[in-house]
Design a protein with these regions (language model features):
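Compositionally biased terminal segments of proteins
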Residues: 1-226
Length: 226
């Protein structure tokens, strides 16, 4: 185990797992939105999957104590019924959803993340192995979109790659996980994609990953998950 150097972050990914949504929750969440006085309130539907997925995005709160952006995803339509005063507009077609949240709409990723999480006081905290899978998939998705000419910040791609290495450095020889075929393929594709552009020794040192190389980390990742 390595004493990794803490890395500052400006956002936190929180996944709300609600299998049976109540009107009380919707009312409470709407109170949260009003107190934050969110300027941008959008809604969208993913028409490319069955059943169709619904998502909401709230951004730019007037109250700086509130999160800058909140996204809600539902794998069923019509579960989130906000009052008419909400004034929710369609998500602009040129805007995209956060990678990790969108990935969780996939059944295999959703179930694996829930199954591979710690539960403290009723809150699921994703384990190392599920975070590695999510970050690997996000890296692949963003890389593919950039290759198609879409506007994708290379810094986001690099961040996901480095996050995988930070996480994989915590795997031990005893770490063994059985992944669904979908996730196993994605992790394998990630490993193949980064072999020609492994993080250098400066990154390993600055991240506090100890006396180890990027190649050793990726080899352990393969042994643990493939």
């Amino acid at each position: 185990m390595y004493a990794q150097v803490p890395r500052a972050t400006k956002d936190i990914d929180i996944i709300l797992v609600v299998e049976a949504l109540s009107a009380e929750f919707v009312a409470k969440f709407w109170e949260f939105v009003k107190k934050g006085n969110y300027e941008q309130r959008n809604k969208g539907v993913n028409e490319n999957v069955e059943p169709k997925h619904e998502y909401f995005r709230f951004m730019k709160p007037a109250n700086s104590a509130f999160p800058y952006q909140v996204e809600l995803f539902s794998r069923s339509l019509g579960l989130m019924n906000f009052p008419e005063e909400a004034r929710i507009t369609p998500i602009p077609v040129d805007e995209d959803l956060s990678s990790l949240s969108a990935i969780l709409m996939d059944e295999d990723y959703y179930c694996f993340t829930i199954d591979h999480s710690l539960q403290e006081n009723g809150v699921h905290i994703a384990n190392i192995e599920s975070l590695i899978c999510l970050k690997s998939k996000a890296f692949l998705d963003l890389s593919q979109r950039k290759a198609k000419g879409e506007s994708v910040d290379s810094k986001h791609i690099a961040k996901h790659k480095k996050d995988v290495f930070r996480l994989a450095a915590m795997l031990t020889p005893a770490s063994r996980y059985e992944l669904p075929d979908t996730l196993k393929t994605d992790v394998s594709d990630f490993c193949d994609a980064i072999m020609q552009d492994l993080p250098n020794a400066d990154f390993i040192k600055s991240a506090g990953l100890g006396n180890v190389t990027s190649l050793q980390i990726i080899e352990q990742l393969k042994k643990s998950m493939l």
